[in-house]
């Protein structure tokens, strides 16, 4: 049973992503319609695959900012229910999305997080992505302050090693749902 994490006071501001929480579910829906790359990306809902909570929506992630001529794309706009933070949900979703990107000929996939969001940065690094640096004053946060973005990437030449690492993490978990 997932709690409504769009409400204020459900976590530290820096763990909320670039937009922060909203006061009501309706406000969150309005935010989501603007925030996610509906027109320029493939937005994926992430659901529980088995067990008593099968089909429960637990998050979202997007493959977007497609630049086919430069063979690069961006995985981002990711948000998961805190109940699944630190589980195999993110590695499994990213394994599928990275595979899709590299199978379709992209040579570089960018991932990024707010520079002060240590949890998200650690999750990206644990995927096997390489830290490239900080883009300063990248985008505004909900509170009006500016976010610096920590930028990471995975190249096509690195993908076999990254894929093997993600598959090993999933194998350690086994077939049981989260």
Where are each of the predicted segments found?
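GNAT-family acyltransferases
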Residues: 1-87, 100-104, 109, 139, ...
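Amphipathic alpha-helical recognition patches that constitute DNA-binding helices
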Residues: 74, 92, 108, 119, ...
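Conserved acetyl-CoA-binding loop-helix of GNAT-fold acetyltransferases
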Residues: 86-100, 122, 126
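Conserved beta-strand-loop-alpha-helix junction that forms the acyl-donor binding cleft
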Residues: 111-121
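Acidic active-site catalytic centers that drive phospho-/nucleotidyl reactions
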Residues: 117, 128, 148
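Short Asp/Glu-rich motifs
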Residues: 120, 143-144
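Conserved acetyl-CoA-binding loop of GNAT-fold acetyltransferases
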Residues: 125-135
């Amino acid at each position: 049973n997932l709690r409504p994490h769009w409400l204020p006071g459900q976590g530290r501001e820096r763990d909320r992503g670039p937009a922060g929480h909203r006061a009501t579910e309706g406000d969150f829906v309005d935010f989501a319609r603007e925030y996610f790359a509906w027109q320029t990306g493939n937005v994926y809902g992430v659901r529980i695959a088995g067990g008593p909570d099968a089909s429960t929506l637990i998050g979202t992630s997007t493959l977007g900012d497609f630049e086919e001529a430069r063979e690069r794309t961006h995985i981002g706009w990711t948000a998961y229910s805190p109940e699944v933070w630190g589980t195999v949900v993110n590695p499994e979703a990213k394994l599928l999305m990275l595979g899709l990107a590299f199978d379709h000929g992209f040579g570089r996939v960018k991932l990024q997080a707010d520079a002060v969001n240590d949890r998200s940065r650690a999750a990206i690094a644990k995927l096997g992505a390489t830290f490239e640096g900080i883009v300063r004053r990248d985008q505004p946060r909900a509170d009006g302050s500016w976010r610096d973005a920590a930028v990471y990437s995975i190249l096509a030449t690195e993908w076999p090693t990254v894929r093997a690492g993600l598959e090993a993490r999933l194998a350690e978990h086994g077939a049981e749902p989260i």
